Design a protein with these regions (language model features):
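Transmembrane beta-strands of outer-membrane beta-barrel pores
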Residues: 31-37, 67-71, 90, 103-107, ...
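Cleavable N-terminal export/targeting peptides
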Residues: 1-24, 252
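Outer-membrane beta-barrel "beta-signal"
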Residues: 194-204, 235-252
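Repeated loop/turn-to-beta-strand initiation elements of outer-membrane beta-barrel proteins
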Residues: 25, 59-65, 93-99, 131-136, ...
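Structural signature of outer-membrane beta-barrel channels/translocons
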Residues: 18, 54-58, 89-93, 126-132, ...
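Residues that define the transmembrane beta-barrel architecture of outer-membrane proteins
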Residues: 23, 45-49, 78-82, 95, ...
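Short glycine/proline- and aromatic-enriched beta-strand/turn motifs that initiate or cap beta-hairpins
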Residues: 16-71, 243-245, 249
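Detector for outer-membrane/organellar transmembrane beta-barrel domains
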Residues: 118-191, 210-211, 251
Length: 252
């Protein structure tokens, strides 16, 4: 997976004529009330700092990285999620498409009960048409987010970003996750989000959303890593519960 990203980075950059579009580099930063990924609260209900950077070549190839703070109550021994991604995207008439590789890294994080790291890699196929989009992510590494022998796990993400006018956008999302591997189906889930984003001058934006996930079983209802805290109690939570998330972001 990382090899794919390094190959993309090694692509030759050809001189552009004055009429050719130039490659673009952008960066972003956010402060959010909590980090929600695929319906789950990654920061145990606490705020998160997030930042990323993207490079896009006019040929359609791109590379990027993104990071967020996370909670070690949800991801054992983790404080940061660090993503690397790259691939190709383009359009045919009004239909957009993308083929991307992702690698999600959680430095120092290991689920101690099994010795499995939380790091994993995915291939992603995406389509978009006007305000609609659909994306399917397929796990290509042996393990998925601390779950062993889960190669082939899939996540379907569909939604719409509806222009409401006056710089407002309605954000709609539904997701469906299926965890591969013997006995791993207890971690299957669905999730949904309804939110709005308001764009401002200077690359600023503000957003608010309500999210919720539903487990196929009660495995998420009293989630714990099984390690006593200083008081000798187990930290438990339902990371899939409905929650409101607000954020302010800046694009550079």
């Amino acid at each position: 997976m990382l090899g794919c990203l390094f190959l993309l980075a090694a692509l030759p950059v050809q001189a552009q004529s004055t009429d050719s579009p130039a490659a673009t580099f952008s960066a972003n930063a956010s402060l959010t009330s909590q980090y929600i990924s695929r319906g789950f609260r990654q920061t145990w209900g606490k705020p998160a700092l997030q930042a990323g950077a993207d490079y896009a070549h006019p040929s359609g190839w791109s590379l990027g990285t993104w990071a967020s703070t996370v909670s070690d109550r949800y991801i054992q021994d983790a404080t940061v999620e660090w993503d690397l991604y790259g691939g190709y995207s383009g359009t045919v008439a009004e239909l957009g498409y993308s083929v991307l590789a992702y690698y999600y890294k959680y430095p120092g994080a290991v689920y101690r009960a099994t010795g499995v790291k939380y790091d994993y890699g995915e291939l992603s196929l995406g389509l978009s048409y006007k305000m609609l989009y659909a994306k399917y992510n397929h796990t290509v590494t042996p393990d998925f987010f601390g779950i062993t022998h889960a190669r082939g796990t899939g996540y379907l993400d569909v939604g719409a970003n509806v222009d409401l006018g006056n710089a407002w956008t309605l954000n709609l999302h539904a997701g469906n996750g299926r965890v591969a591997g013997t006995g791993n189906a207890i971690w299957n889930w669905r999730d949904a989000k309804v939110g709005v984003t308001r764009a401002f001058d200077g690359g600023w934006s503000a957003s608010a959303a309500v999210t919720r996930a539903w487990g196929a079983t009660d495995a998420y209802d009293h989630y714990t890593l099984g390690i006593p805290n200083a008081a000798g109690q187990f930290d438990t939570s339902n990371p899939a519960a409905a929650t409101l998330v607000v954020a302010i972001s800046k694009t550079f």
